[in-house]
A protein has these predicted regions:
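Substrate-binding pocket helix/loop in short-chain dehydrogenase/reductase
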Residues: 132-134, 140-145
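Conserved glycine-rich Rossmann-like NAD(P)H-binding loop of the short-chain dehydrogenase/reductase
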Residues: 62-78
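Active-site helix of classical SDR
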Residues: 156, 192
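Conserved NAD(P)H cofactor-binding loop of Rossmann-fold oxidoreductase domains
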Residues: 124-129
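Residue(s) in the substrate-gating loop at a strand-loop-helix junction
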Residues: 176
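SDR active-site lid
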Residues: 206-270
Length: 316
């Protein structure tokens, strides 16, 4: 039996909890269960900070037991403790790097083997990289594709099949305003978010009569650790717009998911991007994206050598 879906205002969401970054050993997949597991859960990826952290708070505030996953074990443990104390819900931690090829399968195997039925799936984990395509660190670009596209697609596939079998369930995929156009100097990221939007719309249609919904939310600039991790801090995309808080975006995405909306654009920039996608020539939107990404359209190369980037993303 499905529970009701009360929707709390953003000011009812628990604040994010800062936590220092642990060493790389915490990236190994581990799982901690407190108490027996016998109810339907919400699964949120990239739940240790930012939008994912706020979505985890929303589900907990509305009485849902949750599974939270990210790479950073210490941060996940902090979130687990805070949500259990504040909302008296079960919080299961599964620490793993979802860009590893077998990680989505291991996550699904874990929940299945422990009798955890995932009624709500939130694919939030992802990251970006600001650099010229040919100047990028290829291993980082490959990691981005695996996390932003492959992990999301596999989790949607595996848990979507479970939901279809059960006759109910909701999937929320976080895309971006970047999904609407080609993005010079962030080519792989923009392409990955277009993949998320296209996949979400197609699967939503296929599942239209099954009791399972797929919602794709396309946010604009949001105040998380995303820009710093992507080496974008101070670029036009953030300086010429007014970013919303992770809490505001999470509340919007939660409402849209619960309503079963297929495609949702959050904020004026994203709605303007959707309009530009329909009305402007592709050449114009490419130049616009290049400018908003902080590079000039006629610049041949952003940097002579790949830049070092912090290994931090929405999946931390």
């Amino acid at each position: 039996m499905q529970r009701p879906h009360p929707i709390l205002s953003p000011d009812r969401i628990a604040p994010s909890i800062p936590c220092s970054r642990p060493d790389a050993s915490t990236l190994e997949a581990t799982a901690l269960i407190d108490g027996e597991v016998d109810m339907a859960y919400a699964l949120i990826t990239g739940a240790s900070s930012g939008i994912g952290r706020e979505l985890a708070s929303l589900f907990a505030a509305n009485g849902y037991d949750i599974v939270i996953t990210a790479r950073n074990q210490e941060r996940l443990n902090t979130v687990q403790t805070a949500l259990k104390q504040q909302y008296q819900v079960r919080v299961v931690v599964f620490a793993a790097d979802l860009s590893e090829p077998d990680a989505p399968q291991r996550l699904h195997d874990f929940t299945t083997s422990h009798g955890i039925s995932i009624e709500y799936l939130v694919n939030n984990a992802g990251f970006a990289d600001w650099t010229g395509y040919l100047d990028a660190d290829w291993s980082r670009q490959q990691k981005m594709m695996r996390l932003n596209m492959e992990a999301l697609a596999e989790l949607t596939y595996r848990y979507g099949r479970d939901m279809r079998r059960a006759g109910h369930g909701r999937i929320l995929n976080i895309s971006s305003v970047a999904s609407m156009m080609a993005g010079p100097y962030m080519a792989v990221y923009f392409a990955s978010k277009a993949f998320v939007r296209s996949l979400s719309e197609a699967v939503a249609y296929e599942l239209r009569d099954t009791g399972v919904t797929v919602t794709c939310v396309c946010p604009g600039p949001t105040t998380t650790g995303f820009a710093k991790a992507a080496n974008m801090h101070g670029r036009n995309f953030f300086t010429m717009t007014r970013p919303v808080s992770a809490r505001q975006l999470a509340a919007y995405a939660y409402r849209r998911m619960m309503r079963g909306t297929t495609l949702a654009y959050h904020g004026p920039l994203t709605r303007a991007g959707a309009l530009a996608e329909r009305l402007l020539p592709r050449a114009a939107t490419r130049r616009l994206a290049a400018f908003m990404n902080g590079g000039e359209p006629n610049t041949r190369s952003v940097s002579a050598t790949p830049q070092a980037h912090p290994e931090r993303s929405a999946q931390d």
